[in-house]
Amino acid sequence: MIFQSFILGNLVSLCMKIINSVVVVGLYYGFMTTFSIGPSYLFLLRARVMEEGEEGTEKKVSATTGFIAGQLMMFISIYYAPLHLALGRPHTITVLALPYLLFHFFWNNPKHFFDYGSTTRNSMRNLSIQCVFLNNLIFQLFNHFLLPSSMLARLVNIYMFRCNNKMLFVTSSFVGWLIGHILFMKWVGLVLVWMQQKNSIRSNVLIRFNKYLVSELRNSMARIFSILLFITCIYYLGRIPSPIFTKKLKVKETSETEERDVEIEKTFERGGTKQGQEVSAEEDPSPSLFSEEKEDPDKIEETEEIRVNGKEKKKTKHEFHLRFKETCDKNSPVYETSYLDGNQENSKFEIFQLFKEKKEEKYLLWFEKPLVTLLFDYKRWTRPLRYKKNNRFENAVRNEMSHYFFYACRSDGKERISFTYPASLSTFLDMIKKNNYFFATEKLSSDEFSTHWNYTNNQKIKNLSKEFRNRLEGLDKGSLIRDILEKRTQLCNDKTKKKYLPKTYDPLLNGPYRGRIKKFFSPPILNTTYIKNKIRTPWINKIHNLIFINDYHEFEQTIDRFNRKSFSSEEVRSLLTEREREHIDSEDRIKSLNFLFDAVITDPNDQKIRKKAIKEISKRVPRWSYKLIDNVYQELGEYDENVRGKHAFRSRKAKRLVVAVDHQTKGDVSLPHYLEQSDFRRYIIKGSMRAQRRKTVIWKPVQANAHSPLFLDRIDKTLYLSFDISQLMKVILRNWMVKNKNQKLSDYTNAKTRKLDKKEKKKLKGERYQRQEMVRIKQAEGWDKRLLTRILRSSMLVIQSILRKYIVLPLLIIAKNVVRILLFQDPEWSEDFKDWNREIYVKCTYSGVNLSETEFPKNWLIEGIQIKILFPFHLKPWHGSTIQSSHKDPKSEQETDVCFLTIFGLETDMPFGSPQKRRSFFEPIFKELKKKIRKLKTKSFIVLRDFKEGKIKELSKINLREIEKLRETQKNSIISKQMIHEPSIEISSMDWTKLSRTEKKMKDLTNRTSRIRNQIYKITKEKKKGSLTQETNISSNKPTYSVKILDPSKRIWRILKKRNARLIRKSYLFLKFGIEKIYRNIFISTLTIPRINTKPFRESTRKQMKIIEKNIHNNEANPERINKTNKNRIISTIQKLISKTSNKNSKISCNLLSFSQSQAYVFYKLLQVPILNFYNLRPVLQYHGTSLFLKNEIKDFFEKHGIFNYQLRHKPLWNFGRNTRKHCLSGHYQYDLSRIKWARLVPQEWRNRANQHCMAQNKDLIKRDSYEKNGLTHYEKQHFFEADLLRNQKSNFKKHYRYDLLSYKSLNYEDKKDSYIDRSLVQVNNKEEYYSNYNRKKVKLLAMLGSISINNYIGEDDIMDMEKFLYRKYFDWRILNFCLRNKANMEAWVDMDTGTSSNQNTRIGSNNYQKINAINNRVPFYLTIHQDEEINPSTQKGFFCDWMGMNEEILSCPISNPESWFFPEFVLLFNAYRTKPWIIPIKLLLFNFNGNSKKNRTGKKEADLFISPTQKEYFELSNQSKEENELADQGTPRSDAQKQVILGSVLSNQEKDGEENYTGSDMKTRIKKKQSKRETEVQLDFFLKRYLCLQLRWRGAVSFREKILNDMQVYCHLVRLINPSDVAIASIQRGEMSLPILITKKKFALKELTKGGMLIIEPRRLSVKNDGQFFLYQIVGIALVHKNKRKITKRYQEKGYVDKKDFDEFIAKHQKMTGNRNKNHYDLLVPETILLPKRRRELRTLICFNSKNQNGMQKNPVFFNNGKGGGRVLDKNKNLAREKNQLIQLKFFIWANSRLEDLICMNRYWFNTNNGSRFSMVRVHMYPRLKIR
């Protein structure tokens, strides 16, 4: 078995080696190349198939030989560079393919030049066989394009980059191609034989067999192939840039030798610079080389190597390599000349050589240059390239050069090809290799280099570990920390004065991110002071010496060329003209600037050369040799003389939308209006071949939209024969439903179908509207396609307007009134002509913008015009009264108020719309005639009715007895009919089975009616018998009383009979309506109950909670006051519970307020149980995730007050290592950041809070010491720590070790006892204790809102690049008044709403607002929302409800009150979100809100981030002077509370201002009061600048474009009218002007607009460009606590805050603190922090790259020795072992598991990369999840 497995393993490995070998891969790629069929296959197939006989065999052999030889040349060209250059250039195809294809076409088409039948014995001398060979050979060299693509042919080229043995790979790929070719030809032969043997194919019914068909086909084969080749030729013309049919760009260059010589001599005299170029281009009237192009002197030398007849020519323009440098003054650019060879004399010689070459080139290439440019310039404009404009250079860089390219580099110990290798590095490396003979030329193999790489890394690890161990040993010996810590080396500028460079300029601190110090001196200062102070030995660039070692000895002493006296002589200036004097002055200025960089100065003391210049390795970038502009710049050229010419590239089709006309400048304010069609142009240069475009392809015969080939798979490709199955099913179902329409459905289904019919009608209406809109757009595009159509339409519209106004309408008025006169009616001349005068013709632009009645738009005949008719005239037969007109439909009035004129003189609603259907002139006439006819009919009917009534009266005179007899007989007949009717029903009921469904229902209905009728008859008969007298004489002739009573009963019976039948028929509907009515009444009554009772309940709860807040905060003075004042059962139960579990004298924090009524309700429900076992809540409180039943506030409140079992804190915690990242991060509030913060990595102030949480206040949950006794001590420590932190915060802000948060905080939490790095800074004394890990979660983002400005969380961290733009901030626009004229209005922008409490013991909070008076100091304007819970009830209503004066009306509304008793904790964040939207994530709204008024003093530390640098200096000075005073004022808690300042309010005491007014209200304004005069101007400037950072969004269904543009059209028209009131009223009535948008007040506040819901103005995020320095200073870090971080003063040491001896003692997080209560303990300091961050990163990286441990984390060998824990540093406290706690194990690794943002952050920071695309250079291995031993 072992032998078999051994053999099997060897076989598998052998097979893998064979598969991965170069030969097999080459065979595979060569075989794949066979399927790339090109045009050469046509000749090969013709020779193989059509040729017969001996000559045919020879032609087959020659075709096959030429085919194989051509393919072999293609493979060899891959390896052989000269052949590749000859066949790979685009001009090769242009030279070879087109003439050869055209020759074949004209050779084979008209006649045969060679007789294929006559052959000689020597077949090689036969020209036809040679042509067959050449055809197959040459066509094989062309590009493969036919089937399927050229990608298969390029597979071999691509794999060449990865292959080491290239020649073997080329050979094997050729063999593979040969095998594939032989197989393909054999397959073709088999197919042909099969087709000859198949008689069914030859004798097809559709193809009539002809015995001469084969011979005719064989004779015409040459012609068929010539046609195919002609098609190929045309296809190549589409793909290759043809120099014949394209548009030429005119590059204007003068060819006069004298002017060119003069220009070159001028540049030669100026030392190779073109300093006078701009001046000569602007002022010299004579044309020069640069005068026509108006180019900057930034043009880069452009060289192209051209191979013509084996010679290389060099075409060079006189453009010298200049680099543009921006100086401090942007208006005065300085040009710095940089020579690649570093020698100025050599540059002069090179310029002279270029001058001579240019003169020779002029004579040699006077006829060759045009031909060469036309045929071989493959970089010309005909390529489908986009013209990319670069603002720093005049000409644009070609879009064909990549910033990176392929290059072999070493990565992870192996040589790999990097496709993102910087070009400058490879250029630099090549220069060093050529010039430095010390450079190693031999190449190491990959294995040797990997071994060498590993050896080097191991040596580095040993050295670093040894140094690290030595430092730790020194720490164990008790050495000072300042001696142990590694120091940074800082570059000193002066040894005596010890002036250090700024951090941004120090190369030892910032490396490649340092900047350049720009110092400028005038020439006299340079000669006097600069040289005296800088007498030193010369410093020569070592890199320059290394690269240009041959040119180093050619340096010689030169005298300063610049001498100002030679240019400022008045004698010389008097001899020159004014133009020449200006010319020389401009040259002086440019020379003086250039002198700062290029002058070679001679030091008289040491006679050494000092060259003040910066050598930079730069690359020549190919640029366009011409400057192109678009149509926008072409229009600007009409006003700007510097921009001239016609646009040379095609931009998107657009029309000028003229919004208004500026009468001062006499110009139009226009916007581009783009047509609603796809953009096929895509800014392609004119004349470029569109068929060569790769990103916009056309694959259909007719294609409406431009698509990219990347998204072709997402486009529905519908075939011609395809059909939609769903539509077909709909048609079938519809037909089936039509067949069964005779079946009567129920009323319910009928109602449903009616609803569906309504929906379908709406849908059809919308589709009809869309169809009309599409027709309108097509008409507009049709008119817009041609210039002639627009001219024709514009002229037709003007003619139609004149005809309509002055000819047609007056003629109609005359005709109408003449007819009225003929009909003897009054004429209406005045009314008609009044309406005619009211009609106004407004000239509009092509897109419909109103201009004026008289003036035409600019270029209206070419661009087009629209004519809008206001109050169009409609001829009326008569003018009615106002009463009749008031009943008209307002919609019809709106339709007729405005319209557009068509070219046929008709009216339409919108431009290019269909004509409107107007009311006919005769329609009201016909209506009136119909009314008169109807009245006539009614009158005639009345006459006839009267006549009929008279006849009836005459008939009533008949004898009554005869009538009675008739009645009796009628009665008998009715009874008899009833008797006969019943059996008929019974008889017919026997045939029910044969009846239809409807007939059955009718029978049932008749039976029911007959039954009811009989019952009614019986009942009436019985009643009649009881009511009548018994003396009834039936035989008497006179009618008795009983007979008279029977008549009304019969009538009643008949009425009931009809109504019962109707009631039975409609019973279903009655029942339905009744049920709906009952349901509605019940439902509405239930809805009204909470609406009635909610308001008083909410008022009562609000009052109760205010009492709760007041009582809870005042329980220090009166602990029993709560039970007296609060009679509510909820709070009394809570208070009893708290009193049982905590000391009565302890301070109850205000966490209760955070969950307000809603949490109180939950407490009430929990505490209703009389005996509550809190041990049952243990799993709920222990779980650190999201609880399903309890909110986080309840859980944290229970934990803080020790309500649950105290032993819980000693139990093992939740295992975060097995949780997901969400649980891991949510369990620790340091990670409670928004996604925006994690994405941008910009939490500046949060890093200071990460290590300094809240100061603990209880020793242990068992002891629960009261806070009241030692409150001042806690405040002192907090205050002094903050004061010290404030002074050092600016320096801490720029520390390098911000990356530590990501590396230290990313530890795996599976082992709970190893989570020490997460521990925060805690200062402990006898009365204080730290928070344990289980309740760490309580300090949430919202928990700090009481002490820290909420803007620290929502504003500061989310603005990018806050280092550079600290004064740029979000701004709230909802409170600003638009009138910026008065300072009073400025101060009224913000409501100074401060709230205080009457009790002195309570610490007072306020509404921390800021005045805008400090804006001129560039202080960020932000609004701090209310942060304290102890607010007066009178002001609390204003806090929640009347926020910034925005909700005066909403305050009285009980439903929309923000202070909802359901979610009161959302109010603070909601208000902050309204101040700065899109900052607070939704996730944070559900976190804790534990505001503590005691923490208000800590707010100064975060607010320092918002203070400008000038204010900070003042603030630091004031803090230093007040520290002594604050120590004296710490006598009692009451005096300390009185020291608290109402934040945001303006106090007179400057000491308090400096202490608490940290929000930067107007600190510097009080120091410099003179600046208040310019305050309004600065505020206005502030207003306008912030306006640019906002975006506007409209609320409502109407889009912004439609609503605003409609109003703008009306406004632009009203401005031009003399009396616009009538037109304005009419437009308001028509709905064209929206009154909410129309601003009528001069002074208004934006809150009125936002309150109405019309406008929503939201801030837009600032956009800045991120560079390396941004990522350097914005990376998240943790504040390390050591002496360099915190300068510990003597006061701290006296108070016991810092103890040096306890600095290195580390306490486990879950260990009891009973033995160490009197000691101070800090965060666990990672010992590696002794090293500098750079060395620390290097050590960890080397450990991770070289460690082979796969079972655990990557460990530091200093601490981990065979699984043993820590060193002596960590073993000092031996009590840890007695408590059965494991020793601390420090586990380090580079990045966290599965956290890509950490990897990106560290990647950029560690490897100094500021570009995301360079991450592929750093091949970092993502380790799997690390395990715990």
Swiss-Prot record:
Q: Where is the composition biased (Basic and acidic residues)?
A: 260-272
Chain ranges passing through the membrane = 18-38, 67-87, 90-110, 127-147, 174-194, 224-244
The biological processes this protein is annotated with in GO are:
protein transport
- Chief subcellular site? plastid
How does it sit in the bilayer? Multi-pass membrane protein
The answer to keyword Acetylation applying to this record is no
Locate the region Disordered: 260-301
Taxonomic superkingdom: Eukaryota
Any single Gene Ontology cellular-component annotation: chloroplast inner membrane
Location within or outside the cell = Plastid, Chloroplast inner membrane
Q: Which InterPro entries match?
A: TIC214
Which keywords are on file for this protein? Answer: Chloroplast, Membrane, Plastid, Plastid inner membrane, Protein transport, Transmembrane, Transmembrane helix, Transport
What function does this protein fulfil? Answer: Involved in protein precursor import into chloroplasts. May be part of an intermediate translocation complex acting as a protein-conducting channel at the inner envelope.
The miscellaneous remark of the record is: There is a partial copy of the N-terminus (positions 1-363) of ycf1 in the inverted repeat (ABI49067).
Report the sequence similarity comment from the record.
Belongs to the TIC214 family.
Q: How does it assemble?
A: Part of the Tic complex.
This one is known as: Protein TIC 214
Species of origin reads: Citrus sinensis (Sweet orange)
